[in-house]
């Protein structure tokens, strides 16, 4: 028996990169996985590599609260419960404050901050009612280390980290666990557009393994935060 047998997991941003790696690993470990993201074709490509009776594709824009509410509802209707939610959907745009690209600021705030909050608020009532569940938010080292071109992105990821810290305090003694995972540079299509190829990067699988570590601790242990860097 694998370690997550019959656990029901929702993964946002599951069509590629970190989200795809997380969803695939959780499925390999026995979880029933709901794949969420904007691009239905990419989600279906991921699903086609998994066992069809334990995977569900739900195209979802995390900036739309109604779609996120429906995502969680479909997950419960399809598999009969909800145990794990991974907020992996994210957007990284190189946008300085002095560039005045307000539309880019709004987009990153909507995806990275509001998307995380919408998913949490949709999943929490069920988890609180059953006194169990695990929320994992993918933050970033950029939330702690700001470059001249990452101010807004870094601010949104700092917010994700702070949201997770606050949730951990709010949910203490409820049985619901909360974890923030802050990766360094990860080799994905998003980072390829902004970073030199010779810079050391993590593999998306490295982040998936960190997620699995947090999920497989004893019931009395909550891993509050994990930082993952390339060496």
From Swiss-Prot:
EC class (word): oxidoreductase
UniProt keyword Cytoplasm, yes or no: no
Keywords linked to the UniProt accession: Oxidoreductase
Binding site for substrate: 140
Alphabetized GO MF terms: oxidoreductase activity
Cross-referenced Pfam families: adh_short
Annotated binding of NADP(+), by residue: 10-34
Enzyme Commission number(s) from the entry: 1.-.-.-
Active-site positions on this chain: 153
InterPro entries per record: NAD(P)-bd_dom_sf (IPR036291), SDR_fam (IPR002347)
Sequence similarity: Belongs to the short-chain dehydrogenases/reductases (SDR) family.
Protein name as catalogued: Uncharacterized oxidoreductase SAS2370
Species annotation: Staphylococcus aureus (strain MSSA476)
């Amino acid at each position: 028996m694998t370690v997550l047998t019959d656990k029901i997991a929702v993964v946002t941003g599951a069509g590629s990169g970190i989200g795809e790696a997380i969803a695939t690993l959780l499925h390999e470990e026995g979880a029933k996985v709901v794949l969420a993201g904007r691009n239905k074709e990419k989600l279906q490509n991921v699903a086609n590599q998994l066992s069809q009776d334990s995977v569900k594709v739900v195209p979802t824009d995390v900036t739309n609260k109604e779609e996120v509410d429906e995502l969680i509802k479909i997950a419960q209707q399809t598999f009969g419960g909800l145990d794990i939610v991974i907020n992996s959907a994210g957007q990284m745009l190189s946008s300085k404050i002095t560039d005045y690209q307000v539309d880019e600021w709004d987009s990153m705030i909507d995806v990275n901050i509001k998307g995380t909050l919408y998913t949490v608020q949709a999943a929490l009532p069920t988890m609180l009612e059953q006194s169990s569940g695990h929320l994992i938010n993918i933050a970033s080292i950029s939330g702690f280390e700001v470059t001249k071109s990452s101010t807004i992105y870094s601010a949104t990821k700092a917010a994700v980290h702070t949201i997770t810290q606050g949730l951990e305090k709010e949910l203490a003694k409820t049985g619901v666990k909360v974890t923030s995972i802050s990766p360094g540079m990860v080799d994905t299509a998003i980072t390829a557009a902004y970073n030199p190829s010779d810079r050391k990067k993590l593999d998306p699988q490295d982040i998936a393994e960190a997620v699995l570590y947090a999920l497989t601790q004893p019931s009395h242990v909550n891993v509050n935060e994990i930082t993952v860097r390339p060496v």
